[in-house]
Amino acid sequence: LPNSTIEGYTRVRGGWNEGEAYTVYFYAETDTPAESFGTWKGNTLMPNINEQFDSGEKTGAYLSYSTSENQKINVRVGISYISCGKAKENLKQITTWDFNKVHTQAVSEWNNILDKIEVAGNEEDKIKLYTALYHCYLQPVDKTGENPKWISTEPNFDDFYAIWDTFRATHPLFTLLTPSVQSNMIRSLIDIYRNEGYMPDARSGNDNGRVQG
């Protein structure tokens, strides 16, 4: 790897659904080559060692720089549930090192959703409404193309928490504001049923946490 990149993975388990452990891969790059690098395990630094593996003990890698006053070093990170190579590919979604441009694009994409509702009222009530709407669209999460369990051309959504509650208002809201998103969520649920035999009421970490029946 060039001296401006770090890649690796971690195994994750636990959480409310008590699902199987899953792997999260990452690929990180900086806009400035590092002067030195190394890895660490526990409290021990290992300069110039470019690989490190462990199970249970905290492990990582680092890049070191000699910076001038007020110099900024930008970092961008791609993640994947498939591989480090896929994480690197996902990183291509960010085409610039300009943080302000990335921020502006993110704001624009969120406004495409938040602008679908216009209300009159005082500022406090508007903050409550748009904060709630923002929270509605944080999950389920669209992970299409990132299913580590089976190959499918169907949409892939994760982090359903939990449909026995969200069917009352959240999913009807999706149907009104973003019907294509709601349709893709339903297709994802059907695809989960086809491959795992159960329709989840709640799902996280690519695993069913709760099912009916």
Specify the residue positions occupied by each region the protein language model found.
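Beta-sandwich/jelly-roll carbohydrate-recognition scaffolds of carbohydrate-active enzymes
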Residues: 1-160, 191
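Aromatic-rich carbohydrate-recognition surfaces in CAZymes
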Residues: 161-166, 170-213
